[in-house]
Amino acid sequence: MLACPSTSSPWPQRQPPSPCPGGGGGATRHVALAARSKRRGAGPAAAEGVDEAAAEAAELVRSLLRRTAGGKERLVPVLDRHVRVVRTEHCFLLFEELGRRDAWLQCLDVFRWMQKQRWYVADNGIYSKLISVMGRKGQIRMAMWLFSQMRNSGCKPDTSVYNSLIGAHLHSRDKTKALAKALGYFEKMKCIERCQPTIVTYNILLRAFAQAGDTKQVDMLFKDLDESVVSPDVYTYNGVLDAYGKNGMIKEMESVLVRMKSTQCRPDVITFNILIDSYGRKQTFDKMEQVFKSLLRSKERPTHPTFNSMITNYGRARLREKAESVVEKMEELGFKPNYVTQECLIIMYAHCDCVSKARQVFDELVTSQTKVHLSSLNSMLEAYCMNGLHTEADRLLDTALQQCVVPNGSTYKLLYKAYTKANDKLLVQKLLKRMNKQGIVPNKKFFLDALEAFGTSDRKPRTSPGINSASKPSTDSAGDSETATSDKPEVSVWHVAAT
């Protein structure tokens, strides 16, 4: 049925990087550029100068991080070597980048290094940024320690610090306790003149309570917001719509949409995308298609996530022709499918038992890329596993390793779940040996997630979709959405919530 991956498959050839002439001069050049940016004067091109300075600061930070040899060397000695040009703005960028890399301990090292510099002045912005980074990494105690350190340094907390603190608590595992803490800080903010809640505060809390499904508290926060001097914005509504939509709370989502209309807040493309994805997840395809038509008539323009969401949700319902019509519509509107779109197509074909078609898309994707995204490999491996083709998945992984595509924990987790569920001990042992060779040590969560495979099915029952998801595209399908409007009255996004 399937052609096994071979050495002649269209994987991009890896070329060794050419040596950089004068390799040691890169950092010096960036340092000089950053220093020169300090001397730029104001004038008609001041805005352009600011942009250039920001770009040069970002380049200096990248240069500093490169000199840590991928995190093997400590960052502080590198900072010491460039102490003459590194300033607060560079440290801010370092905090952000180190946070993305899960290197929160290095963030603290940079912070301690900052405190020793003559130019350092204790500032709320620094503490706010660090508290935010620690919170995102689940280091709540460290965030609280920084909050107390800030007070000891003579800084008085302001709204931004409390917003970061609320956000940090909401990243903790105990959501009930976290929400109670967040509300406590919120009430405290109201009592301090310099810490009055802003729309950012309300947005954080509204989204958090909507994610928890606490509609009563969401309504209370909206009422509080109506009575305050702060006005809701499109981010306010998008956060709540998205949270309700992902929870499958469609009625609650639609009530927020009605509220949005009553405040005359205009939906943006993210609003449309949230609605399309939410209705698609529930397989309410008639409403999903109505929202798509409304988007085409609006001043907004669809984005790749718009189409990717529709392809994914049609795929889950095994509506292959409708999903393919979305690709046609996409190209008709001048969009070129990106690698994420092709990954969505791979999974869609896997749901529809068209694994050979999925492999064809994957091969085209590999041929068109200079670098194979790991998510693309994972999509094809998942497609094989969904259809019980574990040997083909193992061969594809062999080919990927030969082509220097390095799998990560997510790759091994999806394969381990599939092999374990199929009770294929040989493939499980082979996989664990590969992980050991690569230095990936599975943790408790890895095995717990894999054990869930025994209690749930990777594939949905092959039942016929309901009345809202006919097996063939109708005149109202996404592919015809722009032209098939003459027989029915035009429907806006507001009317969708009312139907």
Curated annotation (Swiss-Prot):
PPR repeats lie at residues 123-157, 158-193, 198-232, 233-267, 268-302, 303-337, 338-372, 373-407, 408-442. One of its GO terms (biological process) is chloroplast RNA processing. Residues 1-45 form a transit peptide. Residues 1-28, 458-499 are annotated as: Disordered. The keyword Chloroplast applies. It comes from the Eukaryota. The keyword Plastid applies. Disruption phenotype: Albino or pale green seedlings. Seedling lethality. Keywords: Chloroplast, mRNA processing, mRNA splicing, Plastid, Repeat, RNA-binding, Transit peptide, Translation regulation. It is found in: Plastid, Chloroplast. NCBIfam families: PPR. This is Pentatricopeptide repeat-containing protein PPR5, chloroplastic. The lineage of its organism: Eukaryota, Viridiplantae, Streptophyta, Embryophyta, Tracheophyta. The gene is PPR5.
